[in-house]
């Protein structure tokens, strides 16, 4: 048995990712539509979606007074079966392509309606 020089970590379960937003309900509904997820909490200042009601992690959108002003320090990456079709679908939902200085890459950087960056990846390399 290996002895660690520090206490073993607690058993952690990833509950959710918090997303600051100007309009939690509108942004949460947009992401629910984009991901095909379900709404599990719809309160005035908090709006939570999950892949299924009892499946984690979720996305919890919370109201903040300030607007987003700089590039995200954390963003989500998605790998669809068909990158081109998924980018077209997300654009039709209201996403936008984003140029954050990434240059030509095999992924597409996009933003949601409040300007939060995320990436749509290409096919996984074998």
Model-found features: residue ranges?
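Short beta->alpha connector loops
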Residues: 80-82, 103-104
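Short, flexible, solvent-exposed loop/turn segments with mixed acidic/basic and small polar residues
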Residues: 63-68
């Amino acid at each position: 048995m290996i002895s660690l020089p520090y206490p073993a970590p607690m058993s952690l379960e990833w509950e959710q990712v918090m997303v600051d937003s100007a309009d939690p309900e509108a942004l949460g509904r947009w992401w629910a539509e984009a991901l095909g997820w379900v709404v599990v909490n719809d309160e005035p200042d908090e709006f939570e979606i999950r892949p299924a009601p009892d499946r984690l992690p979720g996305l919890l959108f919370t109201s903040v007074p300030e607007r987003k002003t700089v590039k995200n320090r954390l963003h989500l990456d998605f790998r669809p079966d068909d990158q081109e079709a998924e980018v077209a679908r997300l654009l039709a939902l209201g996403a936008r392509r984003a140029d954050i200085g990434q240059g030509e890459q095999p992924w597409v950087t996009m933003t949601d309606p409040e300007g939060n960056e995320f990436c749509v990846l290409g096919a996984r390399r074998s």
